Amino acid sequence: MPTQLEMAMDTMIRIFHRYSGKERKRFKLSKGELKLLLQRELTEFLSCQKETQLVDKIVQDLDANKDNEVDFNEFVVMVAALTVACNDYFVEQLKKKGK
């Protein structure tokens, strides 16, 4: 039986491939595919954001090779960065509560 971390990794891989390759290259997310992924899979995160051009900024920041698409490595960097930010927020909330 897979561990929770193994299931989380499997979920990330499956989500990436569910959205990638519909518009262009099979193993990359176009800007439109990434936008759809973010809207459907990170609903809470996006609802708290005030920046209207957030998806464009995310693509620009993630697109290390400047091909205007996001590959799996670039996608994982985004998920990791968001996870770190969420953890930082969680730790700050615990500190405020004195735990």
Curated annotation (Swiss-Prot):
The keyword Ligase does not apply. InterPro entries: EF-hand-dom_pair, EF_Hand_1_Ca_BS, EF_hand_dom, S100/CaBP7/8-like_CS, S100_Ca-bd_sub. Ca(2+) 1 binds at S20, E23, K28, E33. Highest level of expression in spleen and leukocytes. It comes from the Eukaryota. Homodimer. Interacts with S100P. This is Protein S100-Z. It comes from Homo sapiens. The gene is S100Z.
